[in-house]
UniProtKB/Swiss-Prot annotation:
Reactions that this protein is recorded to catalyse: phosphoenolpyruvate + UDP-N-acetyl-alpha-D-glucosamine = UDP-N-acetyl-3-O-(1-carboxyvinyl)-alpha-D-glucosamine + phosphate
Function: Cell wall formation. Adds enolpyruvyl to UDP-N-acetylglucosamine.
Record key words, sorted: Cell cycle, Cell division, Cell shape, Cell wall biogenesis/degradation, Cytoplasm, Peptidoglycan synthesis, Transferase
Main location group: cytoplasm
InterPro entries associated with the record: Enolpyruvate_Tfrase_dom, Enolpyruvate_Tfrase_sf, MurA_subfamily, RNA3'P_cycl/enolpyr_Trfase_a/b, UDP_GlcNAc_COvinyl_MurA
Binding site for UDP-N-acetyl-alpha-D-glucosamine: R92, D312, M334
Residues reported in the UniProt entry to bind phosphoenolpyruvate: K22, N23
Gene Ontology cellular component list: cytosol
Source organism of the structure: Borreliella burgdorferi (strain ATCC 35210 / DSM 4680 / CIP 102532 / B31) (Borrelia burgdorferi)
Cellular localization per UniProt: Cytoplasm
Family: Belongs to the EPSP synthase family. MurA subfamily.
SUPFAM superfamilies documented for this protein: EPT/RTPC-like
Protein name: UDP-N-acetylglucosamine 1-carboxyvinyltransferase
EC nos: 2.5.1.7
Length: 427
């Protein structure tokens, strides 16, 4: 186990290139299972979750070569359809094995997935969609067995716009016989990346970026070369970090077309940034003050399925609000345990009221003091790291494996931006 030792009080700024989106990289890597030809993926972040997925592919017999942020994957055949629970325990995204396996190999046997502790994540929508296509499901001893002799396209309305369920159904449907229509589909940028990658392999997916996808099944997919989009969670985290520490920051290759609503939400906290076709610019001397709603009411910031404000930035919004003059209600609608990390911010001196599992009221500006903190999940971990940079004195962030599940080369990238941080073995 390792920790970060952080010295607070320094400006974070300079120039950085956005990493690839973890939530796009994982399904795109697993989509390589759908062809026996070579798939080349560019801009793949070097993070723990990617390493676990590659370990799974190695274990089943895939050929993988990595050079920097480029992956070459070829899956001529596999040696088994049973996935070791030592892998699935580590990563929630292992659920994305279902679609590719049942589509190309006709069977998968895997344990229920692990991952974050931010709340319950239903699997019902995955099973509904895959079974509508003709798969047969059985469960025993916390293991999932999914089989299909043949998949046939179907029309379906998802009971929730689940990102991973949508991705699983897409990956199963592209090689199914006939047409599939998915209504109430997720349309996040990472879902769009997966669809665009599959189309570059010969799939026929219409409606990309909308909540209705039409998939015309094809008999075979080819190899491809595809570049993963930027990680807008990393970009959002860096915007907060620069603004709260008074730094000036340029984030290159940030895919800012996805930042319209994110920009609006940040502006309600007094954080303003600019962007052009590729880059995001955060200026120093931000006026960090809550903008009240009409009539002088306390503003509410909430999340929802895309294009609403992304749930993965809600933890970042909480720590940001501690450094902004005024009061704001943060309403996490999607996960009932995401807000439980705020006790650690309160320990540092933040003025936060946890109203219930979904809502917190934050009043700023608070003077934070360095402390010893443990990262409960990837996004809360980054929020605590931001708090440590804002705080007076030294902080220790423990369980940094969680942060490194989603953020690439954290220490070196932050040092290059002027941060005082080092990684050490935990006592």
């Amino acid at each position: 186990m390792h920790s970060y030792i952080v010295e607070g009080g320094y400006k974070i700024g300079g120039q950085i290139t956005a990493s690839g989106n973890k939530n796009a990289a994982l399904p795109c890597i697993l989509a390589a299972l759908l062809t026996d030809e070579e798939v080349i993926l560019e801009n793949i972040p070097n993070i723990n979750d990617v390493k676990v997925v590659l370990d799974i592919l190695n274990d089943i017999g895939a050929d993988i070569a990595r050079e920097g942020n480029t992956l070459k994957i070829k899956v001529l055949n596999i040696v088994k359809t049973e996935i070791d629970s030592s892998f699935t325990d580590l990563i929630r995204a292992s659920i994305l094995l279902l679609g590719p396996f049942v589509s190309r190999f006709g069977k998968i046997d895997m344990a229920l997935p692990g991952g974050d502790v931010i709340g319950k994540r239903r699997l019902d929508t995955h099973f509904y969609g895959l079974c509508k296509l003709g798969a047969k499901l059985s469960t025993k001893d916390r293991r999932i067995v999914l089989k299909a002799n043949k998949l046939v396209g179907a029309e379906m309305f998802l009971d929730e716009a689940s990102v991973t369920a949508t991705e699983n159904i897409i990956m199963a449907a592209v090689l199914a016989e006939g047409n599939t229509v998915i209504m109430n589909a997720a349309c996040e940028p990472h879902v769009q990346d997966l669809c665009n990658m599959l189309n570059s392999m010969g799939a026929n997916i219409l409606g990309i970026g909308s909540n209705v996808l039409e998939i015309k099944g094809v008999k075979k997919l080819s190899g491809t070369v595809f570049r993963i989009g930027a990680d807008f969670m990393q970009v959002g985290s860096l915007i907060s970090l620069a603004a709260l520490t008074g730094g000036e920051l340029e984030i290159k290759k940030a895919d800012p077309q996805h930042f319209r609503l994110i920009r609006h939400v940040y502006s309600r906290l007094g954080i303003n940034f600019e962007y052009d076709r590729e880059n995001v610019y955060v200026r120093n001397k931000q006026e960090l003050k809550v903008k009240l709603d009409f009539g002088g009411h306390i503003p509410k910031i909430d999340d929802g399925p895309w294009p609403a404000f992304p749930t993965d930035l809600m933890s970042i919004i909480v720590v940001t609000a501690t450094q902004v003059e005024g009061t704001v209600l943060v309403f996490e609608k999607m996960f009932e345990s995401r807000m439980f990390f705020v006790d650690k911010l309160i320990k540092m001196g933040a003025r936060i009221v946890l109203c219930d599992p979904h809502r917190v009221v934050v009043t700023g500006k608070s003077s934070l003091k360095g402390n010893v903190l443990s990262s409960p999940d990837v996004r809360a971990g980054m929020s605590l790291l931001i708090a440590a940079f804002v705080a007076e004195g030294r902080s220790e962030i423990q369980n940094v494996y969680q942060i490194e599940r989603g953020y690439e080369d954290v220490v070196n990238k932050l040092i290059n931006l002027g941060a005082k941080i080092k990684k050490v073995k935990s006592q």
